[in-house]
């Protein structure tokens, strides 16, 4: 008689799971209450807690729950206590008043399998190594002085993007521009030139003719979107650790696959960069600086190659996906609200004219366009839920007891749609930021009504770069082209696709018509 090993295995798994479930259920029933005065929230179920309530769009589900339970609510997600802040006052309490207590992040499957076991800057433990990584980025890439130093790179790469779009618009039958691909093309090469001193990505159709390219932009864009999607998923194993090894959703498997692809790409970049190091001896780029940091002890800390790769992964993914998604949403809103696009064109024509490209120095003189950017950050924040934080110690927030090791989620999407803060929050109305009430609100983390980059000491390190890139690239696209939908398309599909970054479910395609002289579309 033969024995079916696979059947025995699954029966064993089922038996162990049943035992653990029964054990946990009994503990749940008879465990004494030490809840003090926790924030209100849904009860959930034994073992799984409130996980099923999150659905496929957790930011929307959590916003709906906050209407019932309040702006500070407590959920048990599996075995993990989680507090959710859903209005500006609650966000300020956690991200400013109690910022130090929530300065670390939980180490889950995402940081483990995608970010080299949290050896990057985004997920690293709050401490000396995180501070060194952040300092290096600020000094050489993301700080105000660094942004000035590489402003010419931004102008040049936007020029390459405009050239590609102009060529597509000039064909006998204009080809619709796939907006996210063009944005990734510009932003990834912008970051590549700062880090590597070269343009690592090309339009897919031109890959064979480019000897220096590391990858096609469409391939890279797919990898970035997959990584950001997976990193935003609620993995059951993160919240019920004793079944994590089963990988019931297949998320860990998929994370390992996409991380391997990035690792191959990053290793290739570093190898090629090392081989040409002598050419940059007198003018080192950011990767040269990082590699030097692996050979020296800086402030008692020494980086290693894993830290370098993990940081490059942060910069190439977050540096392209978050800003490009905001720009895509803004263009989608303007295509659905033609009067907003027309008013932006009128303002730009009055201030800039139509004989040259927009410059960064023009933006302060374009208040209506700036209002469009802010309104997009409000309604379509690049990160709908902040990356989770975790409390180091128990604390009291607004009269509620928050236990030690409680996860914190700030629902940035819900804050931007809070009807107590924003009149008609579901409408796309840039004019609201021209009123005295909201005119001085800035998206860089100081006004908790609008925190698309987060706030506090773990605010997005690229907030300054992200805000400036959105303004400059979106402004250039609006000023340089007229925009219309492809034939047969009446309205832009505005459905969301959830992840760390909030993408459009259907990528935006549009027909563009040049508004400036042909010389404006050359590099």
Curated annotation (Swiss-Prot):
Keywords: Heme, Iron, Metal-binding, Monooxygenase, NADP, Oxidoreductase
Top EC category: oxidoreductase
Positions that bind heme: 460
Cofactor names: heme
Enzyme Commission identifier(s): 1.14.14.81
Top-level division of the source organism's lineage: Eukaryota
Pfam families: p450 (PF00067)
Catalytic reaction annotation: a 3',5'-unsubstituted flavanone + 2 reduced [NADPH--hemoprotein reductase] + 2 O2 = a 3',5'-dihydroxyflavanone + 2 oxidized [NADPH--hemoprotein reductase] + 2 H2O + 2 H(+)
Keyword Cell cycle: no
A biological-process GO annotation: anthocyanin-containing compound biosynthetic process
Entry-linked PANTHER family: CYTOCHROME P450 98A9 (PTHR47944), FLAVONOID 3'-MONOOXYGENASE (PTHR47944:SF18)
Physiological role: Catalyzes the 3'5'-hydroxylation of naringenin and eriodictyol to form 5,7,3,'4',5'-pentahydroxyflavanone and 3',5'-hydroxylation of dihydrokaempferol and dihydroquercetin to form dihydromyricetin.
Protein name, per record: Flavonoid 3',5'-hydroxylase
Organism: Campanula medium
């Amino acid at each position: 008689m033969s024995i079916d090993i696979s059947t025995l295995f699954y029966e064993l798994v089922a038996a162990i799971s049943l035992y653990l479930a029964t054990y946990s259920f009994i503990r749940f029933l008879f465990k004494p209450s030490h809840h003090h005065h926790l924030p209100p929230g849904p009860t959930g179920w034994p073992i799984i807690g409130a996980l099923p309530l999150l659905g496929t769009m957790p930011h929307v589900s959590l916003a709906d729950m906050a209407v019932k339970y309040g702006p500070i609510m407590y959920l048990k997600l599996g075995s993990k206590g989680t507090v959710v802040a859903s209005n500006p006052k609650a966000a300020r309490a956690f991200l400013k008043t109690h910022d130090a207590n929530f300065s670390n992040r939980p180490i889950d499957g995402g940081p483990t399998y995608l970010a080299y076991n949290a050896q990057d800057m985004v997920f690293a433990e709050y401490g000396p190594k995180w501070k060194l990584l952040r300092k290096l980025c600020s000094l050489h890439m993301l700080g105000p002085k660094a942004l000035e130093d590489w402003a010419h790179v931004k102008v040049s790469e936007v020029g390459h993007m405009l050239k590609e779009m102009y060529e597509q618009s000039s064909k006998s039958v204009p080809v619709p521009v796939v907006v996210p691909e063009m944005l990734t093309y510009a932003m990834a090469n912008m970051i590549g030139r700062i880090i590597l001193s070269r343009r690592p990505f090309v339009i897919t159709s031109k890959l064979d003719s480019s000897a220096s390219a590391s990858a096609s932009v469409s391939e890279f864009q797919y990898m970035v979107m997959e990584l950001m999607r997976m990193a935003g998923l609620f993995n059951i194993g993160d919240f019920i650790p004793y079944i994590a090894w089963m990988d019931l959703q297949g998320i860990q498997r998929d994370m390992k696959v996409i991380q391997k692809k990035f690792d191959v790409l990053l290793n290739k970049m570093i190898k090629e960069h090392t081989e040409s190091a002598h050419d940059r001896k007198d003018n080192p780029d950011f990767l040269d600086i990082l590699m030097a940091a692996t050979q020296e002890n800086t402030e008692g800390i020494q980086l290693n190659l894993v830290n370098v790769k993990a940081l490059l992964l942060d910069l190439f993914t977050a540096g392209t996906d978050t800003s490009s998604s905001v720009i895509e949403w803004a263009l989608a809103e303007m295509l659905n609200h033609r009067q907003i696009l027309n008013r932006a064109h009128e303002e730009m024509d009055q201030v800039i004219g139509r004989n040259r490209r927009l410059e960064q120095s023009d933006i302060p003189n374009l208040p209506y366009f700036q209002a469009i950017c802010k309104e997009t950050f409000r309604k379509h924040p690049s990160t709908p839920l902040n990356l989770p934080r975790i409390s180091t110690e128990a604390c009291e927030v607004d009269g509620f007891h928050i236990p030690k090791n409680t996860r914190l989620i700030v629902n940035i999407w819900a804050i931007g749609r809070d009807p107590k803060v924003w009149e008609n929050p579901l409408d796309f109305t840039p004019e609201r930021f021209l009123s005295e009430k909201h005119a001085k609100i800035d998206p860089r983390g100081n006004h908790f009504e609008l925190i698309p980059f987060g706030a506090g000491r773990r605010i997005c390190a690229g907030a300054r770069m992200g805000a400036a890139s959105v303004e400059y690239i979106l402004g250039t696209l609006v000023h340089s082209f007229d925009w219309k939908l492809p034939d047969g398309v009446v309205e832009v599909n505005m459905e969301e696709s959830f992840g760390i970054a909030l993408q459009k479910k259907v990528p935006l395609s549009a027909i563009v018509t040049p508004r400036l002289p042909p010389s404006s579309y050359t590099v």
